[in-house]
Amino acid sequence: MKKWTFDEAKEIFSFSFMELVYQAQTIHRANFDPNKIQISSLLSIKTGSCPENCKFCPQSSHYKTYVKKEPLMQIEDVITAAKRAKAAGSTRFCMGAAWRGPRDEDLKLVCEMIKEVKKLGLETCVTLGLLKEHQAVTLKEAGLDFYNHNIDTSEEFYNKIITTRTFQDRLDTLRYVRASGMKVCCGGILGMGETNDDRINMILTLANLEEPAESVTINKLIKIPGTPLENVQDIDPFDFVRVIALARIMIPKSYIRLSAGREQMSDELQALCIMAGVYSIFYGEKILTSANPMPERDNDLFQKLGIIH
């Protein structure tokens, strides 16, 4: 597996926009059907009161936001949501809990949720925070397909965004997930005040993992009132597309997922993202606690682009 250098990554990022998107689309076509997209759904199964201080997150207990604390959902309610997602066209169902990391007793309930969702024929992913090694094994034994744990940004910019857990903590969790035999879902957030070099370094970290993540989530910051990043300057849309193209070129076989922030994107920007290598979006009225494009808008966009899902 090729190990990329920063200079190599920066050279690619600095291509003319047309050349960069052309190369990304060429690699995308070699590995994926350019006229298809995977539909995923993401449900918050435990909301709010998270002890971490991630400056972007409305669920952090450190900030006063619109999010209300809600306990871990009942299994029956999760299954109802999963059935609804499948009926709407999702083939992948993700569950997220606002924890620093799960307690073993809570993990048992999550494992039951995973088993029931799997019975519906859906691919499963959960994001529960930091894991211990034995917890990763437990999730694998429950049949979990993917575990999501984002690095969020570059190692150099990380401490400007989060101080309650380290960048290495995140890498350790990814290592436990990989060792258990599960697939890794990992990405980050763009538009938190980081530089293009930080964005390049984030993709470089993902590309140079011992085994690259099978799933790479790219989020655009949703500026939430009450969080420290509510007034940060927006990322330039062309730089956003450049990061996606860079990820496609450096991590050619991974599913690149356009995640949070689509509600604030134009159809034209989303189309450019798909052209640059996105193969999956999160579908439904909400992504965790934040608004997502209505399904009708997504279906209209897919029809305009001739995309099958």
UniProtKB/Swiss-Prot annotation:
Output the SMART domains linked to this UniProt entry: BATS, Elp3
The chain positions of domain Radical SAM core read 35-259
Q: Which SUPFAM superfamilies match?
A: Radical SAM enzymes
- GO BP terms in the entry: biotin biosynthetic process
On cofactor binding, the record's note says: Binds 1 [4Fe-4S] cluster. The cluster is coordinated with 3 cysteines and an exchangeable S-adenosyl-L-methionine.
GO terms (molecular function) for this protein are: 2 iron, 2 sulfur cluster binding; 4 iron, 4 sulfur cluster binding; biotin synthase activity; iron ion binding
UniProt KW keywords: 2Fe-2S, 4Fe-4S, Biotin biosynthesis, Iron, Iron-sulfur, Metal-binding, S-adenosyl-L-methionine, Transferase
Pfam families cross-referenced by the UniProt entry: BATS, Radical_SAM
The UniProt record lists the keyword Iron: yes
Q: EC number(s) per UniProt?
A: 2.8.1.6
Enzyme group, top EC level?
transferase
Q: Which domain of life is it from?
A: Bacteria
The residues the record assigns to binding [2Fe-2S] cluster are 94, 125, 185, 257
Provide the catalytic activity annotation.
Answer: (4R,5S)-dethiobiotin + (sulfur carrier)-SH + 2 reduced [2Fe-2S]-[ferredoxin] + 2 S-adenosyl-L-methionine = (sulfur carrier)-H + biotin + 2 5'-deoxyadenosine + 2 L-methionine + 2 oxidized [2Fe-2S]-[ferredoxin]
Q: Which InterPro entries match?
A: Aldolase_TIM, BATS_dom, Biotin_synth/BioAB, Biotin_synthase, Elp3/MiaA/NifB-like_rSAM, rSAM
Sequence positions that bind [4Fe-4S] cluster? 50, 54, 57
Supply the PANTHER family for this chain: BIOTIN SYNTHASE, BIOTIN SYNTHASE, MITOCHONDRIAL
* Entry similarity comment: Belongs to the radical SAM superfamily. Biotin synthase family.
Q: How does it assemble?
A: Homodimer.
Q: What does this protein do?
A: Catalyzes the conversion of dethiobiotin (DTB) to biotin by the insertion of a sulfur atom into dethiobiotin via a radical-based mechanism.
Please report the name of this protein according to its UniProt entry.
Biotin synthase
Organism of origin is Rickettsia felis (strain ATCC VR-1525 / URRWXCal2) (Rickettsia azadi)
Native organism taxonomy: Bacteria, Pseudomonadati, Pseudomonadota, Alphaproteobacteria, Rickettsiales
Tell me what gene encodes this: bioB
